[in-house]
């Protein structure tokens, strides 16, 4: 496979060279084992035994726990976080092929506090459970907040059913507050920044110090494990719903609405003032970074002039009724970058975003569905949303986005609601949606997207051609010739034939297809998809600890005409682990091993070519140990290499590239 062969684009002995752009999947290289099978088994046993010995020598770290967040709800009907009760469902968990109802959560003031399993204080107000019949099979779950407000969808009156529930729980947050540093705006391709609070982006706006977003970013800065940071941020994003409940019951199945009654929940993430600053200070181009569109009389119009989107042009289009869509705001906003860079590890798939600003009394886009899982974060103003189920089974979990629909193409919405600041709306791929501003109020929202073409079908699409190729090489049954007369009974014109030869032919195909699983290079294709994810990923954002203990925090500087504090070196006694969990992947290509990494990625999608280091065979087991032992520390002298030189060479190369951190600062 030409695009994956070892060539001059590799990194050799620490020298960085660009690799050519990868080619589409082809045959033999991905199926090649890195070593003979028996040796690989022995090496894996060796690595496993070393890891077991390492764990026996050290105390169990809290970061080594499974990254999944423990749910506060067991089975349906148990109380959710914040006193919200989940509506019981006698049918149990829905299979993937069926779509359940819409779920709505009303976040109480208690649940709006920063949540933690510690320091729980019982509140006085009992929770309530409501069932609303605004659409067929629609389900609305509401907490005890007296200010709750539901938008009716011109249907029969809702039925309200009182239900007893456990008392709401209040979370003590004072212990989680800590000071953070604000980052200055940075260019799209730089060294990783520190995780900190919301950024003003040079707009001069006053950001609230004690906002929910500020508090969660401060909390993340204190969590040493990147996988736990990702889990915690996602828990905050969908709070008060437990992540376990969301993934088991709702992910890829149902639309979800979370009401928080807290307009400050996302404050500091993005704003119209930040957008104005970006238009003034950045090279924003119409069509590439910014779209201007409007939906009038059942038709969508895109009114992008050529060239740069200067404030005069952009705001004139806005005044003319156009919605402004900022593509890839993470390239311009440090806070959005921080937000997505942490969350991408939760999804195991690229996390992207767009920002939409819609003027009052207007609609920017026609009804349509997308090919991504969408999380809508309402930042400013209000917007009326209508969400519809997939019309036919082929649209469920759609693989591609739809064309624009007319109103006549739509049925009754499964959800109709007005989003206000702090609210969250989730809907799966294939759910049709449209949104409009009313009542003289503008709207600003950010859509977080993920899971584009990340399906079993996409995986098998890469596996099966390689499996057929391997089967033909290794099994003579796949090389036997077709019957000379097969065209006499096979094909569409013979589809109704009862010829026994046709039955035998179909049975032979089924037998051969069943045997393909034995030849499928599943691990090799998984590595290739992981490599693609590494290239798709945003560069990591570092905590204060990660920066201080990595090459990014070394005190080397220019002073008095010469560099000072040069010479810090790793030794065999230095304890190290990977900088973060998802920043690197070891991949076999063309009989060689390469470590692909994210720390030099750009905030602009695929602006940089994939970056990698070549790992030599004598260092392969040590590299695997480092990748698999995170977040536990490993002594450089305990790395499974034949020589001390190989141990120090590997550790130094990784440290100098910003891929390792040390237990103690180097001096």
Swiss-Prot record:
Cofactor dependence is on:
Fe(2+)
Q: Note down the stretches annotated as region Disordered.
A: 1-99
Q: Which residues carry this modification: N-acetylmethionine?
A: 1
Reactions catalysed: N(6),N(6)-dimethyl-L-lysyl(36)-[histone H3] + 2 2-oxoglutarate + 2 O2 = L-lysyl(36)-[histone H3] + 2 formaldehyde + 2 succinate + 2 CO2; N(6)-methyl-L-lysyl-[protein] + 2-oxoglutarate + O2 = L-lysyl-[protein] + formaldehyde + succinate + CO2; L-histidyl-[protein] + 2-oxoglutarate + O2 = (3S)-3-hydroxy-L-histidyl-[protein] + succinate + CO2
Please list the residues that carry the modification Phosphoserine. 61, 64, 108
Biased composition of type Low complexity is found at: 1-11
Q: Which UniProt key words apply to this protein? A: Acetylation, Chromatin regulator, Dioxygenase, Iron, Metal-binding, Nucleus, Oxidoreductase, Phosphoprotein, Repressor, Transcription, Transcription regulation
Q: Where does Fe cation bind?
A: 368, 370, 433
Biological process, per Gene Ontology: negative regulation of DNA-templated transcription; negative regulation of osteoblast differentiation; regulation of DNA repair
JmjC domain location, by residue?
A: 322-467
- Tell me which GO cellular component terms the UniProt record holds: nucleolus; nucleoplasm; nucleus
Co-factor binding comment: Binds 1 Fe(2+) ion per subunit.
Q: What is its main location?
A: nucleus
Q: Which residues form the signal peptide?
A: none
Task: Enumerate the subcellular locations listed in this protein's record, separating them with semicolons.
Answer: Nucleus, Nucleolus; Nucleus, Nucleoplasm
| An example molecular function term from Gene Ontology annotations | histone H3K4me/H3K4me2/H3K4me3 demethylase activity
Q: Where is the composition biased (Basic residues)?
A: 12-22, 35-44
Instruction: State which Enzyme Commission number(s) the record gives.
Output: 1.14.11.27, 1.14.11.79
From the record, give the transmembrane residue ranges.
none
What InterPro entries does UniProt report for this protein, alphabetically? Answer: JmjC_dom (IPR003347), NO66-like (IPR039994), RIOX1/NO66-like_C_WH (IPR049043)
Q: What does this protein do?
A: Oxygenase that can act as both a histone lysine demethylase and a ribosomal histidine hydroxylase. Specifically demethylates 'Lys-4' (H3K4me) and 'Lys-36' (H3K36me) of histone H3, thereby playing a central role in histone code. Preferentially demethylates trimethylated H3 'Lys-4' (H3K4me3) and monomethylated H3 'Lys-4' (H3K4me1) residues, while it has weaker activity for dimethylated H3 'Lys-36' (H3K36me2). Acts as a regulator of osteoblast differentiation via its interaction with SP7/OSX by demethylating H3K4me and H3K36me, thereby inhibiting SP7/OSX-mediated promoter activation.
Q: Hey, which family's this protein in?
A: Belongs to the ROX family. NO66 subfamily.
Please describe the quaternary structure of this protein: Interacts with SP7/OSX; the interaction is direct. Interacts with MYC. Interacts with PHF19; leading to its recruitment to H3K36me3 sites.
**PANTHER family for this protein:** MINA53 MYC INDUCED NUCLEAR ANTIGEN, RIBOSOMAL OXYGENASE 1
Protein name listed in UniProt: Ribosomal oxygenase 1
């Amino acid at each position: 496979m030409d695009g994956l062969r070892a060539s001059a684009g590799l990194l050799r002995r620490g020298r960085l060279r660009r690799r050519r752009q990868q080619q589409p999947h082809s045959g033999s290289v991905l199926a090649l084992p890195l070593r003979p099978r028996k040796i690989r088994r022995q090496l894996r046993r060796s690595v496993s035994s070393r890891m077991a010995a390492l764990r026996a020598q050290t105390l169990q770290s809290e970061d080594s726990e499974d990254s999944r967040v423990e749910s506060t709800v067991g089975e349906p009907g148990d109380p959710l976080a914040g006193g919200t009760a989940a509506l019981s469902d006698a049918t149990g968990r829905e299979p993937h092929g069926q779509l359940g109802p819409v779920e709505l959560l009303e976040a109480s003031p208690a649940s709006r506090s920063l949540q933690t399993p510690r320091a729980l204080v019982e509140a006085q107000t009992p929770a309530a459970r409501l069932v609303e019949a605004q659409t067929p099979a629609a389900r609305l779950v509401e907490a005890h907040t007296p200010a709750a407000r539901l938008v009716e969808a011109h249907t029969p009156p809702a039925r309200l059913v009182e239900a007893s529930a456990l008392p709401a729980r209040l979370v003590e947050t004072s212990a989680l507050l800590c000071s953070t540093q604000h980052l200055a705006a940075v260019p799209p391709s730089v060294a990783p920044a520190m995780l900190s609070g919301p950024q003003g982006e040079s707009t001069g706006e006053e950001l609230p110090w004690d906002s929910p977003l500020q508090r969660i970013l401060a909390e993340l800065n204190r969590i040493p494990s990147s996988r736990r940071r990702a889990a915690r941020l996602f828990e905050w994003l969908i709070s008060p719903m437990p992540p376990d409940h969301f993934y088991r019951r709702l992910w890829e199945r149902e639309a979800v609405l979370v009401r928080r009654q807290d307009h400050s929940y996302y404050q500091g993430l993005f704003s119209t003032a930040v957008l104005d600053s970006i238009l003034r200070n950045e090279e924003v181009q119409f069509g590439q970074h910014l779209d201007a569109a409007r939906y009038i009389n059942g038709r969508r119009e895109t009114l992008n002039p050529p060239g740069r989107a200067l404030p005069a042009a952009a705001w004139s289009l806005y005044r003319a009724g156009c919605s402004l869509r900022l593509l890839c705001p993470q390239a311009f906003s440090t806070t959005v970058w921080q937000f997505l860079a942490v969350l991408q590890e939760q999804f195991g798939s690229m996390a992207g975003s767009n920002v939409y600003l819609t003027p009052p009394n207007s609609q920017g886009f026609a009804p349509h569905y997308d090919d991504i899982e969408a999380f809508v974060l309402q930042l400013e103003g209000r917007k009326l949303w209508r969400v519809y189920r997939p019309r036919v089974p082929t649209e469920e979990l759609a693989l591609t986005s739809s064309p624009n629909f007319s109103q006549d193409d739509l049925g009754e919405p499964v959800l109709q609601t007005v989003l206000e600041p702090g609210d969250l709306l989730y809907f799966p791929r294939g759910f049709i949606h449209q949104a409009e501003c009313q009542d003289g109020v503008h709207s600003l929202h950010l859509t977080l997207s993920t899971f584009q073409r990340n399906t079993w079908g996409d995986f098998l699409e890469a596996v099966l051609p390689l499996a057929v190729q391997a089967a033909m090489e290794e099994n003579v049954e796949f090389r036997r010739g077709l019957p000379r007369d097969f065209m006499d009974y096979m094909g569409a014109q013979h589809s109704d034939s009862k010829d026994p030869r046709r039955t035998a032919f179909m049975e032979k195909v089924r037998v051969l297809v069943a045997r393909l699983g034995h030849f499928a290079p599943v691990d090799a294709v998984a590595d290739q998809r992981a490599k693609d994810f590494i290239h798709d990923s945003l560069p990591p954002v570092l905590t204060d600890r990660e920066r201080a203990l990595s090459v990014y925090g070394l005190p080397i500087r220019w002073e008095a005409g010469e560099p000072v504090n040069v010479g810090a070196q790793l030794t065999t006694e230095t304890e190290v682990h990977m900088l973060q969990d998802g920043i690197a992947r070891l991949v076999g290509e063309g009989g060689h091993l390469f470590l692909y990494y994210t720390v030099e990625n750009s905030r602009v999608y695929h602006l940089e070519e994939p970056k990698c280091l070549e790992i030599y065979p004598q260092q392969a087991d040590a590299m695997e140990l480092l990748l698999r032992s995170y977040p536990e520390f490993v002594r450089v002298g305990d790395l499974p290499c034949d020589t001390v030189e190989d141990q120090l060479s590997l550790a130094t190369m990784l440290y100098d590239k910003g891929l390792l951190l040390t237990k103690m600062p180097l001096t």
